[in-house]
């Protein structure tokens, strides 16, 4: 089961989140039938949103949009504070040549664009923030968002590793943040450790990458695990929700579906689930609108 572990240095100088998101990204790949580069780009976006959602309180919903002018198209993810995330990528078929080590490149092909976040607190006034894509690698773009929009300097690492058949082998990441009150000496020590950390791909390839991430982040410094919470890919779509959407259409449009298509098929963008509405279903909706 996927999980996020929240921790804090015993000194109180900084905190860290580490994630195992393997099942989340594997299920997203399965549902959307994504090829290698699309899988990694979508996976990184899902992991970034899992981190962002874990930083919120209450019943907030968080939307992350990675909008570039590349062949990937838009990448959209929605998460809640209960560990659930869903998402899709417009172009599922991007399969760009890998590096000599087999790693999938994303940044050089993302193009210009923006990292957009929408945090809905349920009050009717969602908070929206837009920052430019800095590298297109998504992790660095997420870190830039945290620094610019939330005024919280953060170190972010996230990635998706694929096997020889381009299926998800492992996915995960981390976030490290300096906390208020940290001394200059503690900040310098933290920055030095991050600079010396192995690459995220190397750490994810470890037998237990969650422990490997924690060890790389804290080194010999004592720390406390604050919580361990489950994560999952979960879509909240339903037949009832799409039926309500059909109710908003003009009667003429619904009648055209009956006359021309003998019904309607609606496919959820986020999970690919198909919902069928036959002629009788559509006629009932028309009658309900009367």
From Swiss-Prot:
Redox regulated molecular chaperone. Protects both thermally unfolding and oxidatively damaged proteins from irreversible aggregation. Plays an important role in the bacterial defense system toward oxidative stress. Keywords: Chaperone, Cytoplasm, Disulfide bond, Redox-active center, Zinc. It comes from the Bacteria. Pfam families: HSP33 (PF01430). GO terms for biological process: protein refolding. One of its GO terms (cellular component) is cytoplasm. Disulfide bonds join 235-237, 268-271. GO terms for molecular function: protein folding chaperone; unfolded protein binding. This is 33 kDa chaperonin. Under oxidizing conditions two disulfide bonds are formed involving the reactive cysteines. Under reducing conditions zinc is bound to the reactive cysteines and the protein is inactive.
């Amino acid at each position: 089961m996927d999980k996020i572990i929240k921790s804090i240095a015993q000194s109180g100088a900084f905190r860290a989140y580490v994630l195992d998101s393997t099942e989340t990204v594997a299920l997203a790949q399965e549902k959307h039938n994504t090829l290698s580069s699309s899988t990694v780009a979508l996976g990184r976006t899902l992991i970034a949103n899992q981190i962002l959602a874990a930083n919120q309180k209450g019943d907030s919903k968080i939307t992350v949009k990675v909008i570039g002018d590349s062949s990937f198209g838009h990448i959209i993810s929605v998460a809640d504070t209960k560990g659930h995330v869903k998402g899709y990528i417009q172009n599922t078929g991007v399969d760009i040549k890998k590096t000599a080590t087999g790693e999938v490149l994303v940044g050089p092909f993302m193009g210009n664009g923006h990292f957009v976040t929408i945090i809905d607190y349920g009050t009717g006034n969602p908070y929206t923030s837009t920052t430019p894509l800095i590298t297109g690698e998504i992790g660095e773009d997420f870190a830039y968002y945290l620094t610019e929009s939330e005024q919280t300097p953060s170190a972010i690492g996230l990635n998706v590793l694929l096997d020889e058949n381009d299926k998800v082998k492992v996915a995960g990441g981390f976030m490290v943040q300096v906390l208020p009150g940290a001394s200059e000496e503690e900040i310098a020590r933290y920055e030095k450790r991050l600079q010396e950390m192995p690459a995220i791909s190397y750490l994810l390839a470890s037998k237990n990458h969650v422990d490997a991430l924690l060890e790389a982040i804290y080194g010999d410094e004592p720390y406390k695990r604050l919580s361990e919470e489950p994560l999952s890919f979960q879509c909240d779509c339903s037949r009832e929700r799409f039926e309500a959407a059909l109710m908003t259409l003009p009667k003429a449009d619904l009648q055209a579906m009956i006359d021309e298509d003998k019904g309607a098929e609606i496919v959820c963008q986020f999970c690919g689930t198909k919902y069928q509405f036959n002629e009788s279903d559509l006629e009932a909706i028309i009658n309900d609108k009367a």
